[in-house]
Design a protein with these regions (language model features):
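Flexible loop/turn segments at secondary-structure boundaries
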Residues: 40-45, 66-68, 74-76, 144-147, ...
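C-terminal beta-sandwich/jelly-roll accessory domains of carbohydrate-active enzymes
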Residues: 144-263
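Carbohydrate-binding surface patches
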Residues: 111-161
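Intrinsically disordered, low-complexity coil segments
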Residues: 42-44, 104-120, 177-179, 212-213, ...
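Conserved, mostly hydrophobic/aromatic
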Residues: 58, 137, 166
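Glycan-recognition surfaces
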Residues: 1-71
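Catalytic cores of secreted or luminal carbohydrate-active enzymes
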Residues: 55-107
Length: 263
C-alpha cells in the first residue's frame, strides 16, 4: 500500500533525478513518484540539460512541468506540446508497467576519467506492460567521451517469445548546438552567434537519426540494439546521433503484427 503520490526531491536536475529515481525504484512503483520538468539552468545545480532529457527522465513516473511558459521560446513550447501528447499515449505503461534497471550512474569504477569509456556513464531503464506487449526504454548519457560513439541499448523484462518492433522517438536539432561547425556546410562563412547564424537556426532544423529494428525479446535483451553512431567530430546526417553531454533517448517496443499472426 502506497501514498497516491510522493514528492521525491526538490532537486529536479535531470542527471540527479536519474540517480534519485533509480534509487526509489527499489522500494516504490513509479506510479507514486512525482517527476517535474523544470527550467534551466536548474535551480538546484545550475546545470544546463536538454529539454528532451528533462522530459524523458521525468516521463518515467508522474510527469509534470514547472516552467514559465510565457518566457519559453516558441519551439520549446511546441516541443512540450509534443512531449505531452507522447506521454499521454504511453502513460499506462509508464506509470503502471514493471520497472527494470539496466546500467546506472552509481556503477562507476571510480576512475573519474573523461577520456576513457568507464562504467557509470550511462543509465538504462525499461518499463514493460503487464502483458509484455509494450515497453519503453531510456538511454541516458552523463558525459561525452571521445572515440566511444558506438552504444548498445539492452532491454529488460521482455518476453523472449514475442517479436517486437523497436524504434526511437525522432528529434530535430538546433543548428546552434554545432557552433561554428556550420561552416563545414555553409556556402559562405557564418560567424558563430551572429544574426545570420540565428536566422539559419530559426529556419533550418537538422533531422535526427532513426533506429528501427524488428527482433525477438531475447535478442533485444541479451544481444541488445546497436544504436546509430554518435557524432564523432565530423560528418552529420540522419544516420548519426546528436548525443552531447547529458543527452538521452527514449525507445519504444511494441509486439509486431507478424508475431501475433504466428501465435
Amino acid at each position: 500500500c502506497y501514498f497516491p503520490q510522493i514528492w521525491a526531491s526538490d532537486d529536479t536536475d535531470a542527471l540527479c533525478r536519474a540517480e534519485i529515481q533509480t534509487g526509489y525504484s527499489y522500494g516504490y512503483p513509479q506510479s507514486v513518484i512525482s517527476n517535474h520538468v523544470s527550467s534551466c539552468p536548474n535551480h538546484q545545480t545550475l546545470r544546463v540539460t536538454p529539454l528532451e532529457t528533462r522530459f524523458q527522465v521525468a516521463a518515467f513516473g508522474i510527469m509534470g512541468y514547472e516552467c514559465n511558459l510565457k518566457e519559453m521560446k516558441k519551439e520549446e513550447r511546441e516541443a512540450i506540446k509534443q512531449q505531452i501528447i507522447l506521454y499521454k499515449k504511453w502513460r499506462k505503461t509508464l506509470q503502471f508497467g514493471n520497472f527494470y534497471r539496466g546500467r546506472s550512474f552509481p556503477d562507476s569504477d571510480g576512475s573519474g576519467s573523461v577520456l576513457a569509456g568507464i562504467h557509470g556513464n550511462v543509465t538504462e531503464w525499461t518499463i514493460v506492460s503487464e502483458d509484455q506487449k509494450q515497453a519503453v526504454g531510456l538511454y541516458l548519457q552523463k558525459m561525452v567521451q571521445p572515440n566511444t560513439q558506438y552504444d548498445v541499448y539492452y532491454a529488460k523484462g521482455l518476453s523472449e517469445e514475442i517479436q517486437y518492433h523497436f524504434y526511437n522517438r525522432r528529434l530535430q536539432h538546433n543548428i546552434n548546438e554545432f557552433g561554428d561547425l556550420v561552416n563545414s556546410v555553409a556556402p559562405v562563412h557564418v560567424r558563430q552567434g551572429s544574426l545570420a547564424h540565428q536566422l539559419i537556426a530559426k529556419f533550418v532544423k537538422l533531422d535526427g537519426e532513426i533506429d528501427d529494428v524488428t527482433a525477438y525479446g531475447d535478442t533485444l535483451m541479451y544481444n541488445g540494439v546497436k544504436l546509430k553512431p554518435a557524432f564523432g567530430g565530423t560528418g552529420f546526417n540522419d544516420q548519426v546521433r546528436h548525443f552531447p553531454d547529458f543527452a538521452s533517448r527514449m525507445y519504444f517496443m511494441e509486439e509486431n503484427e507478424k508475431s501475433k499472426e504466428s501465435i
